Amino acid sequence: MNKKNIKDSQNFITSKHHINEILRNVHLNTNDNIIEIGSGKGHFSFELAKRCNYVTAIEIDPKLCRITKNKLIEYENFQVINKDILQFKFPKNKSYKIFGNIPYNISTDIIRKIVFESTATESYLIVEYGFAKRLLNTNRSLALFLMTEVDISILSKIPREYFHPKPRVNSSLIVLKRHPSKISLKDRKQYENFVMKWVNKEYIKLFSKNQFYQALKYARIDDLNNISFEQFLSLFNSYKLFNR
C-alpha cells in the first residue's frame, strides 16, 4: 500500500492518562514479548517497554521511526523496524503477543495477516468501532473466516476525542485470542466455498430442501439472521455429511 495513504489514515493517542486507561484492559506481563504494529510517535511503545520483556515496533514512516527510537533510547528491551506491516514476516518458533493502533483503511488486511500468518497467542488492536462490530457479525464472511482461528471480543470503547487528528467515528479496543483451528487443512477450501455461498444466501446451492430443514434443526437454528459461530460450524458439518 502507498506509504502516504497509510500515513494519512493514522490517528494518534498521546495522552498518558488515556494510554494507561486503554492498557488496563490489555493483559500483559514482564515475560511477554510484544510486536507493536505502528509505533506512531512512541507513546504506546514507551508504556509497553516499561511493562513487557521485549517490544519490537513495526513502523512504515521513517520519520516516526526516528522519533520513537529517540524517545526510547534508554530502553534496551525495545527496537523499531522501518517496514510496512503487510510486508513483515512474523517470527516462527517464538512466543509473542501483538498490540497496535492500526490504520482504519487497512484494518482488514492487517487482521487477516495477523490471524493467518502470525502465531500470536493474543492480539490487542485499536480499530474503528463499526469495524469491530462487523468482526462479530456471523452474517459476514470475514467474521466466519477469522473465527475458525481466534475468539474475538470487544474490550472497551474509545472516544474519538482521545485521538489527534480527531477521526469522525469512535474506536474500540479488541482482542483476538488464538485457539486450535476449527477447520482442518483438508477442509479449508470447502469451508471457504461454503461461507461465500452462505453469506450470499445461495442456500439452494448448498442443501436440498429436506437437507436444509435437517441441518437447521440439528443446529437448533430458528433465525437465519441470528446464529452463533458454533451453529454455523454445525451447518458446515451437516453439509460435509450430505456431500460425502
UniProtKB/Swiss-Prot annotation:
GO biological process: response to antibiotic
Catalytic activity: adenosine(2085) in 23S rRNA + 2 S-adenosyl-L-methionine = N(6)-dimethyladenosine(2085) in 23S rRNA + 2 S-adenosyl-L-homocysteine + 2 H(+)
Protein's UniProt name: rRNA adenine N-6-methyltransferase
Cited SMART domains: rADc
Molecular function GO labels: 23S rRNA (adenine(2085)-N(6))-dimethyltransferase activity; RNA binding; rRNA (adenine-N6,N6-)-dimethyltransferase activity
EC number: 2.1.1.184
Domain of life per record: Bacteria
Keywords: Antibiotic resistance, Methyltransferase, Plasmid, RNA-binding, S-adenosyl-L-methionine, Transferase
Cysteines paired by S-S bonds: none
Family: Belongs to the class I-like SAM-binding methyltransferase superfamily. rRNA adenine N(6)-methyltransferase family.
Cellular component GO terms held in the UniProt record: cytosol
Enzyme class: transferase
